Amino acid sequence: MTYEVIIADDVSTDATAEISRFVDGLVICRNQTNQGFLRNCNQAAKAAKGKYIMFLNNDTKVTEGWLSSLVNLIESDDTIGMVGSKLVYPDGRLQEAGGIIWSDGSGWNYGRLDDPDKAEYNYVKDVDYISGAAILLSVDLWKQIGGFDERFAPAYCEDSDLAFEVRKAGYRVVYQPLSKVIHFEGVSNGTDVNGTGLKRYQVENSQKLKEKWADEFKKQCVNDGNPNPFRARERSQGKKVILVVDHYVPTFDKDAGSKTTYQYLKMFLKKGYVVKFLGDNFLHEEPYSTTLQQMGIEILYGDHWATGLWDWLKLNKDEIDVAYLNRPHIATKYVDFIKENTNIKVIYYGHDLHFLRLGREYELTGDINIKREADYWRAIELSMMRKAAISYYPSYVEINAIHAIDPEIKAKAIPAYVYDHFLGDIQEDFAKREGLLFVGGFAHPPNADAVLWFAKEIFPYIREQLPDIKFYVVGSKVTDEIKALEQPGNGIIIKGFVSEEELANLYASCKVVVVPLRYGAGVKGKVVEAIYNGAPIITTSTGAEGIPQVEQVLEVEDDPKTFADKTVALYQDNDRCRQMCEGTQKYIREHFSMDGAWKVIEEDFSR
């Protein structure tokens, strides 16, 4: 990024006066008489020519990415008016992860002297204020406000006041944990509030701040002498809080279940919820954890949470509205404690109905061990559903299977994927596309079975008619058996895990997506994703299960030879491919949009 450095020199007596001899390109604003911190900032800010102005104290040391992370954040959301850094002492302890102003006017540097790497200090959040040692806002907003209010001259509380002014102007004040600044607090103005130095103004100006913003202070969280900062630390008073629990932080580019969780997390944020996320492995996994934290989601990770979660739930039981528990093997670990110790509403999302999927696999294979596994999961899943306020699955097929066993269970079908952005530039010239594509993670057994079946029973028929055709296989955790399918000259190309960008390119360049699933349950995320990407698709009845108005977007066939023939026919019919592609975005808007999904579940989220 381009930037200018303005030195606000308030009649310094050290080597600052000679800095232009050693550093080129500086804008130096040197006062003739000492103005004090506040007026010095106001005066020097007049020289700023850029879009943003960053106030950085002289008693600081910056770290890698400190500035770009602030700029990226403020430019990501036009409701944000001011952003600020995580401040850390030279000894590595935390000085502040945003500031709290209580209703009585008292203030906290949230997290002071704690470990700055703890989860609660590392997500983007609204805050009451950010210490002025490192804050950034637009020059236009700075001018609109009029700079620091000079009633707080020479120093102290001007940063808190500025934050309230930013909110008065209709914008948010937001903390950016990726911007880490080491602050040698007290070097500039000392630490004695009772002495004759500048620090004494801290007490006087606190009273002025309280008087100026008396009406606003009434809306602040209450300090009862031992306050719980759960809401005050992120200005979440009046907002609903949802705790989402899954097996781990969603690896949204690796598997369909993670993508579902990730998209619903985004939807909850969009609908105004404060979102807390708990991965059952308590790990901080990159780049996925930082992605969620930069969205504003607090992730409960680390040994502190592994041992302290139950106490945290008890302490904050009245602050959390909904516990959204994913997958039966995870949800069962938490549901009993939540129901026995809190009034938090439990909503359960099973992802797929395990006993139905395994029952179908047993019917296909006759393996008695799979039948035993299906029976085991049937007991687990039904027990979990009976404990939840309501349970979700991706298709009515699963809901009907549940109600065939127990009509009293409250359950409904919800969209497997939910989108808030729709594609507008899909390549519809199918004469320029080539190859078949399969996408699916191989930790999920139905996907491995599908590729093996296609490669052995279907693809040879296709190659007889289209000898040069390629079959691209994409997915994480590729097994050795899948890798062995790729042989010289056989047209099978095992891509394995690819980035989101490369996957988008494959969707745009491959002609037909095949989803040859022989067993499974519910709506398949890979099918919805392929529709979203405008792909002509051929699948089985299992792959098409739960897809509404399936004839609009899919070709369906279960017989291997006929599947091959239909694939060849579709591959050679560019007009049919284009017709299937043209309707995909309208279809996704109707059936798999965030707003549409919220209409289905909104009534379930009342406390």
Q: Which functions belong to the PLM regions below?
A:
Residues 65-71, 122, 126-146, 151-182:
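A short, conserved alpha-helix in the catalytic core of glycosyltransferases
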Residues 85, 103-128, 143:
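Short, flexible, basic/aromatic active-site loop/helix in glycosyltransferases
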Residues 53:
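Short aromatic/hydrophobic "clamp" motif used to bind/position activated sugar donors
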Residues 60-102:
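Conserved donor NDP-sugar-binding/catalytic core segment of glycosyltransferases
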Residues 319-321, 389, 508-522, 535:
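Acidic donor-binding loop of glycosyltransferase active sites
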Residues 31-48, 64:
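Glycine-rich, basic loop-to-helix element that forms the pyrophosphate-binding segment
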Residues 253, 257-266, 277, 386-387, ...:
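Conserved catalytic-core segment of nucleotide-activated headgroup transferases in glycan assembly
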